[in-house]
């Protein structure tokens, strides 16, 4: 226990930087948020300005302290959570970035990943890093910068450049260039890290021609990395003490720290993580093997899967079909009918991800009869989010042999009670929605608070991780399996839809 009263979580996201101030009971006291510029130099390319990331993030830090009317000596520690994979390379001596940050969504390195596949590296990468070969991850982005920015490779080979994901950049800036670190969760997203030995992988560095001197030191997610001054020179020195990538921070914020515990974040898509304890499981279903935290913030493992289209399908009902005026209306229409009247919506607008991995699948509505109306289509669209979640969780359970204990949930769509109840019904497990919705920030705050003694241990936090509502499954097993079988049939018919057109 400490006389300090607050923890600050810096939540550096893809579209905005936020600072969240939490008290000793893990309540959100104040939030400051600033959006920053999305840069699209060409189709499929996405960049951020690293100096703007830092400017927005540091200003929210000062702003949240000012808004709450507190002094900086009341702050115990700062924790950081961040958009993962986004890649920054800067000069060691000046701290000046040599290029914009290349964002996780950016597809510019597709030709590099194609070559990795053609050269037969796919299996090695999967077995060593836990990842699939895709432009999403940091390694090929670093290579692109070294190959395409004038003078960058020569400087890197002389030891003059540093690489970091966004967490590393923020810690570097917060500590005035004294500390160059990352944590295990972020390192596991680079495609340069051996998740079994927990070391940077020499063979991957050789394949991508990246000098080892650029890489940060990898540390636990809960420890003191350095100090920062709030309010410039002569200000109070505050420990920077927790780091985790956004999805792993959310897993920790839900207190999912043991094998068999899982969370799903419902946003535009869904991000699911299932904790697998000290076992790194190689998926047979195209899921990622990634590093997550145990109770002490030390590295253990998780399986990660994502659904491409979740909340985006409700936006489609609103913006394209115009059958709901507002996303919130979807619950009202869905509950006007007792079932979907045999209608299934497969929202494969951009293909299907895990466990199907079919880029040629396309969206479809099946089972329409003359009696099908707006309510049935809205309901079937919401149901598709729950069905896709079951698809991924079944793949996770078959890979891991872990039986899901319960599902913790966060993200915008969790406010939809119909969807949460249907999710519980179709999974046959309890779905738990927390009181504090800022779960990602909570995870970073917990990691920082435990490192500095603000909280004693995770048991102290369990009382604070309050569940706002538990959705318990309907016990009708026959109905559950009949509905899911219908979904599988609908998916099967939407697969490879666009393929014939290209032949």
Curated annotation (Swiss-Prot):
EC number: 2.7.1.30
Notes on how activity is controlled: Inhibited by fructose 1,6-bisphosphate (FBP).
Swiss-Prot/TrEMBL keywords: ATP-binding, Glycerol metabolism, Kinase, Nucleotide-binding, Transferase
One biological process term in Gene Ontology: glycerol-3-phosphate metabolic process
Comp. bias regions, Basic and acidic residues: 468-481
UniProt keyword Disulfide bond, yes or no: no
Residues that bind glycerol: 84-85, 136, 246-247
SUPFAM superfamilies reported for this sequence: Actin-like ATPase domain
Residues reported to bind sn-glycerol 3-phosphate: 14, 84-85, 136, 246
GO cellular component: cytosol
InterPro entries registered for this protein in UniProt: ATPase_NBD, Carb_kinase_FGGY, Carb_kinase_FGGY_CS, FGGY_C, FGGY_N, Glycerol_kin
Keyword ATP-binding found: yes
Region listing for Disordered, in residue ranges: 468-489
Residues where ATP binds: 14-16, 268, 311, 315, 412
Record-annotated disulphide pairs: none
Catalytic activity reported: glycerol + ATP = sn-glycerol 3-phosphate + ADP + H(+)
Residue positions binding ADP: 14, 18, 268, 311, 412, 416
Pathway assigned to this chain's UniProt record: Polyol metabolism; glycerol degradation via glycerol kinase pathway; sn-glycerol 3-phosphate from glycerol: step 1/1
Function: Key enzyme in the regulation of glycerol uptake and metabolism. Catalyzes the phosphorylation of glycerol to yield sn-glycerol 3-phosphate.
Record-stated family: Belongs to the FGGY kinase family.
HAMAP family hit by this protein: Glycerol_kin
Name of the featured protein: Glycerol kinase
UniProt gene name: glpK
């Amino acid at each position: 226990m400490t006389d300090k009263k607050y923890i600050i979580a810096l939540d550096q996201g893809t579209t905005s930087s936020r600072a969240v101030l939490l008290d000793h009971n893990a309540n959100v006291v104040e939030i400051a948020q600033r959006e920053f510029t999305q840069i699209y130099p060409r189709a499929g390319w996405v960049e951020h300005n690293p100096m703007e990331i830092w400017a927005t993030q540091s200003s929210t830090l000062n702003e949240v302290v000012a808004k709450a009317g507190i002094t900086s000596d009341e702050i115990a520690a700062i924790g950081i959570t961040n958009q993962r994979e986004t890649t920054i390379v800067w000069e060691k001596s000046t701290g000046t970035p040599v290029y914009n940050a290349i964002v996780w969504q950016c597809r510019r390195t597709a030709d590099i990943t194609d070559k990795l596949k053609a050269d037969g590296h796919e299996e090695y990468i999967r077995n060593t890093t836990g990842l699939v070969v895709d432009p999403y991850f940091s390694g090929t982005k670093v290579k692109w910068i070294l190959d395409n920015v004038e003078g960058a490779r020569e400087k890197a080979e002389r030891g003059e450049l540093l690489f970091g994901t966004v967490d590393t950049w923020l810690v570097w800036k917060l500590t005035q260039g004294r500390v160059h670190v990352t944590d295990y969760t972020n390192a596991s997203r680079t495609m340069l890290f051996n998740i079994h030995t927990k070391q940077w992988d020499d063979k991957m560095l050789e394949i991508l021609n990246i000098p080892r001197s650029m890489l940060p030191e990898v540390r636990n997610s809960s420890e003191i990395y350095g100090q920062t001054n709030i309010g410039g020179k002569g200000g109070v020195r505050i420990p920077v003490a927790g780091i985790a990538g956004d999805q792993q921070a959310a897993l920790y914020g839900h207190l999912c720290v043991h094998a068999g515990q899982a969370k799903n974040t419902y946003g535009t898509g869904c991000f699911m993580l299932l904790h697998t304890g000290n076992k790194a499981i190689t998926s047979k279903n195209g899921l990622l093997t990634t590093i997550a935290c145990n109770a002490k913030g030390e590295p253990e493992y998780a399986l990660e899967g994502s659904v491409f289209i979740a909340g985006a399908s409700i936006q489609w009902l609103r913006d394209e079909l115009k059958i709901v005026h507002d996303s919130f209306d979807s619950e009202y229409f869905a509950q006007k009918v007792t079932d979907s009247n045999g209608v299934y919506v497969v929202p494969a607008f951009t293909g299907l991800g895990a466990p199907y991995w079919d880029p040629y699948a396309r969206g479809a509505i099946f089972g329409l009869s003359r009696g099908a109306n707006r309510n049935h289509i809205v309901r079937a669209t919401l149901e598709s989010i729950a069905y896709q979640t079951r698809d991924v969780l079944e793949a996770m359970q078959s890979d891991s042999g872990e039986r899901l204990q319960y599902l913790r949930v966060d993200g915008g769509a969790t406010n939809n009670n119909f969807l949460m109840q249907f999710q519980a019904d179709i999974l046959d497990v309890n779905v738990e929605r927390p009181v504090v919705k800022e779960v990602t920030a909570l995870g970073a705050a917990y990691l920082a608070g435990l490192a500095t003694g603000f909280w004693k241990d995770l048991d102290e936090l369990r009382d604070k991780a309050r569940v706002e509502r538990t959705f318990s499954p309907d016990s009708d097993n026959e109905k559950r399996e009949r509905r899911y079988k219908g979904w599988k049939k609908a998916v099967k018919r939407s697969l490879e839809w666009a393929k014939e057109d290209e032949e």
